[in-house]
C-alpha cells in the first residue's frame, strides 16, 4: 500500500493556530524522491516538520516558543517498518534509529534544554493492533522518567490506550483521522 495526497489538502489547516507534522512514518518511503519536496512544501506553509534526519544524519526536533514557553517535538518510526519498506532511491532518511540511540538523542536534548517541554511522537505497533505492546509502554515510561513531557503514538490505525504517568500524558495510539477505518 502506498499513500499519497494532493498538496491542496494542506489548505484545510490554514486557520489552525499551530500545525506540526511528523514525517517519521513508514509510508514516507513509498515515494522517497518526494520526502524533501514534501518537507519543503510544508515549511513553506508555516507547518512545522520533524522526524526526518538532517543531511548530516543528525536528528533535530521541531522547536517553537509560545507565550514564553519553549517546545520541542521529536518523531520516530519503529525500525521494523523501515527495514521492510526501505529507501533505495536517495540518502534521505526518516528517524528510525534503535530505541536506545533515539532515547540518547532525546535525553541529551532534554539535559541541554531543561526549560523546554519535549514531546516524542512515536510511529509504532502493528496495523490494527488493539493492545499496547509492553516494550512500547516501557519505552514511553523510560522517556517520561527522564524528563520528556509526553509521548504520542500512532500507526495501528485504531485507538489504543492512554494514561497519565507521573502526571504526564502518554497516548499509545491515536487511531485514524484521515484514513479509512477499514485499513
Model-flagged regions — what are they?
Residues 13, 42, 109-112, 143:
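Generic structural signal for hydrophobic
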Residues 48-66:
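A substrate-binding/cap region within the structured catalytic cores of diverse enzymes
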Amino acid at each position: 500500500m502506498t499513500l499519497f495526497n494532493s498538496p491542496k489538502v494542506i489548505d484545510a489547516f490554514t486557520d489552525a493556530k499551530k500545525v506540526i507534522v511528523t514525517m517519521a512514518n513508514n509510508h514516507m518511503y513509498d515515494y522517497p524522491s518526494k520526502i524533501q519536496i514534501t518537507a519543503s512544501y510544508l515549511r513553506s506553509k508555516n507547518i512545522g516538520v520533524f522526524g526526518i534526519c538532517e543531511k548530516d544524519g543528525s536528528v533535530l526536533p521541531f522547536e517553537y516558543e509560545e507565550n514564553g514557553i519553549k517546545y520541542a517535538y521529536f518523531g520516530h518510526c519503529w525500525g521494523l517498518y523501515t527495514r521492510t519498506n526501505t529507501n533505495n532511491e536517495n540518502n534521505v532518511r526518516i528517524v528510525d534509529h534503535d530505541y536506545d540511540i533515539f532515547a540518547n538523542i532525546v535525553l541529551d536534548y532534554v539535559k541541554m534544554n531543561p526549560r523546554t517541554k519535549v514531546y516524542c511522537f512515536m510511529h509504532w505497533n502493528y496495523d490494527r493492533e488493539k493492545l499496547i505492546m509492553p516494550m512500547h509502554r516501557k519505552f514511553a515510561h523510560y522517556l517520561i522518567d527522564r524528563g520528556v513531557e509526553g509521548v504520542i503514538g500512532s500507526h495501528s490505525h485504531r485507538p489504543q490506550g492512554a494514561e497519565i504517568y507521573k502526571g504526564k500524558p502518554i497516548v499509545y495510539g491515536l487511531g485514524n483521522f484521515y484514513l479509512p477505518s477499514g485499513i
